[in-house]
Amino acid sequence: MVGYWHWHSLHNAIETYWKGLLGHDFEPNPTYNEAKTIGADFNRLNDDLLGFRKKNDVAFFVSNEAMTGFDDFSFGWFSSEKYNDILRPFYDALYKMNVGVDFVDPSTIERLDNYKMIIVPILYAASDEILEALNTYVENGGHIVYTFKSGFSDENVKVRHTKQPGLIRKVTGNYYNQIVKPENVTIKGDQYKLDAKDEEVKYFMELLTTDSDTEVLAYYDHPVWGNYAAITENKYGKGLATYIGFMPGDKLIGEIFKDQLKKANLWGKDQELTFPIIIKTGVNKKGKTIRYFLNYSAKKQSLDYKYGKGSELLKGATIQSGQLLTLEPWGVQIIEEN
């Protein structure tokens, strides 16, 4: 769906300057004229674009209960960070890496097995049943990535009496009973090869101790807390559970996900391209693969087209595998594979 706010600009009240396709004078303008070209293209290409279906192998597990519980406490008094402030950087990292994701929640818990990887950010409040379902997902071969403050309290926001991170501890292979507000802390012993400034530890950190067979992907770089794990990875059943005990910066999140995607066999041609080139792939009603190549920048962008031979639908050009594609500033090409 392509939606516009609004059809025309309102003339009074709070939405006066939430401009529409038409201005306050109801006259055609560049925005309106551009929308007309989009409508004409859609009308011309209906048979190729309608019925577009997309299958994602990665999902975020989100929860209104966890959001409400975390937002009430955050990281303590005077902390301004909310649930979505933690979720969004993790989503943004995958978006920029051209990894399509779905969002699932406790009401769709039975769909977990549809995904090869599930990211679970700050699942602060959750019932035993939900945590056990996530454990079963890993046991059956799923790859899960938890962040800090997951499994901490039950659905009533009552903190669990067990070692943290609660019931998920048996799949994460770690535990903690000390938490710290980080100051001048980075990580060490990792393979992410970033500058120290990009390996910062933000907002909050859990001092993780691991079970004997749990792998440590990073430790905290700090004179007192250097023996504690920061990122851990544990095999459980047929699957793998990764646990991030702190809030990373944007570049570090990207490197963590790059490593995790490769381990889950989810690193492919799309991931060789990064923002501002964004790729959206699906199948149309004719059963043919459609790829949208979008340039979200004010500069021309070029890429090697490494997919199957096809047709660029907007201009009708034939596209060969290995051909160089050039995207105009803010431009798009839509390629249907033969």
Question: Predicted regions span which residues?
Answer:
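Carbohydrate-binding surfaces of carbohydrate-active enzymes
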Residues: 1-338
